[in-house]
Structures are given as C-alpha cells and as structure tokens.
C-alpha cells in the first residue's frame, strides 16, 4: 500500500441503493448508403477481401484435416485445428482501425485474428516498411521461401503471401514457419504486426494481455491491447481476475499526473454460444447476456456493449468508439461480440450437441454472403468484382498450400 486511505465508517454504513445504466445491445443500424461517407469503395472491398482470405484459409485447413487434401493437393496434418469459419467479420472489423502499436492477444481459435490484424497492418504500412520487416524477420528465411512462389506485382501482395505462408508453415510445424514450427496452431504469432500469441489454455490470454497493458501504461508506450477470448472462457477464474486487475480503483484514485487513468485494454469476447460442447447462455454460464458482466467490475460497467459480429461495419463502429475511451484513459472496456462457428470445436467434433436446423439458421446470416449482398445492393460493386476476389484468393491459397 503506497498510501494510507481513511475508511470512513459513516460512509460505509450509509443507506442507499446502487444504480446501473442500460447496456446497449446491437444498436448499430446504419445502411451502406449512410456509411459511404465513412468508407470508400476501396475500403468496403478491402474488408470483403480480408474476410475472403480468412474464409479460404480456414476452408483449406478444414479440407486437409477431414479429407487429407485441398484442391487436389494431398497432405496430412495430425495437429490441432480450431477453426473460425463464420467469425470472419468479427475479426476483420476488430482489426480494421488497429495500428502497429496496438497489440492483440488471441482466443482459443485465433487463425482469423492473426490474419485479420496482419492484413490490416499490411494495408497501413508502406512498401519500404513491409520489405524491412520481411527481410529482417528470422534472417529473411520465410521471405526467401515466399519469393520462390513466383512473381508478384506489388509489395503488398508479397506481404499477403508472406503472412499466409508463414502462418500455414507454423501450423504445419515446418521450419519456414514464423517460429520454425515450434508454436503450431495454438501459439502462432507475428510480433512485427502487433500479433501476439493465442493460448491453448482457455482464457489464458486474459492475464497475459493485462500484463501487456500494464507494461504500456507504466512505460508510457503508444497503443492499446486487445484481449480476445471466447464465451467459454468466462467460466475461468483468471479471466475475472484479469478484468478486476485492469480495473483497479488505484489507477484513478492514487496514480498521479499523466499516469492517472484506466488501463488501455479491451476485453473482447467472441460470443459464439459454445464452449466446446457446452452451450454457454442457458446452460453453463449464469450471466444470460455476457455484456452484463461489465456491471459487476466497474462503476462505468466497463463501457460494456453487445454488438453484431456478423456485420464488419458494426464491429468497426464499436471499435472506433471504444478506442477513443481507451486512449482517453477510461479503460478497461468489455465487448460482447456475437458470432458463430460453422465448424465444430475442432475438426474431430461431430456437433452432436447442436442441430442441423440451428446450423442452417445461422448460415442464413453468413457474413460472406450478407455483407457481399449489402454491397451489391448498394451498388458499391457488382457480383463480378466479388467473384474475382474469391477466385484470386483460392488461386493464392492453392499456390501457397502446394509449396
């Protein structure tokens, strides 16, 4: 205790009532036409492109895990694969506004988070910056392997191949992986883009990310920290401990000068309704609405909000507002991001705990379909443009997988 604080018995024993504010649930309702003043055609299409890259990456892994082949390429990989097909919009929306100085720590199924943050970084960095990163990373070994794939027409395309090849090689335990294959699927990361590891321990990123946020705070470092977790992690004590640590009163009451203020950390929960085979809401958890938990942590209720993770623009809208709070010293923040995984907990999961009717109902809101349709209807681009992106994405992924 650095300071002695008087605990007033009269204040402690005073009668009264606690009051709580309303917590917003899925309040975003803007149309594409309304968003055209905030996003260019290139912006809209880049969001779709990044979602398509992630979907194809996960589709490729699913095919290899279940059929030992992808587009005629035979390969067997016995390692784990926790896929995020269906969660692309949540990951891309989150990463869209984040910079290199913003760190993301992954959830239990973090391929989409790794790729989304990396693709966002590639878009923001200059060609010279990208080349320097690729040339200097592990002595340029991964870059040299990527350059052998064939000619490219831009540095950014080279960087996209680099991140896909390095991530896939890491998952397949190959030496050209970002960490020589030692991390694998559950511990893949790429620090030059602010992508920190995910964790095989459910909820394990929460205390680690909180430590990173404390590091940024005490050392006056730029950027914020995003702790990603699944809704299943809310049954784990370290997650609550991390949120409490990040929200300690002393940051606002005892720390002085420019050090006064909350921790720069956003606890984002990818709320896909399941923790392995257990249904969280209505079965294994007690919160009913996950965003409610913020009310039990801080008087500000952690600025908690429930958002539609099937709409990347809704996620970007929420991230913009929450980033302002964090940069103004008003953290921590809690986001309950609704999403859904179309594959099982892992590729060996038979999905016995959910019905085909449920899966089909959620697939009607597949972000790859609904976001594309919204852009076509708003005349941002025609179907041919989207078909070209998909074809290019499949061709690139096939080339990388073959090598």
Task: Please tell me what each predicted stretch does.
Residues 1-27, 324-403:
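Glycine/aspartate-rich loop-and-adjacent alpha/beta segment that forms the canonical ThDP
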Residues 111-112, 271-274, 311, 337-344, ...:
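Glycine-rich beta-alpha junction loops
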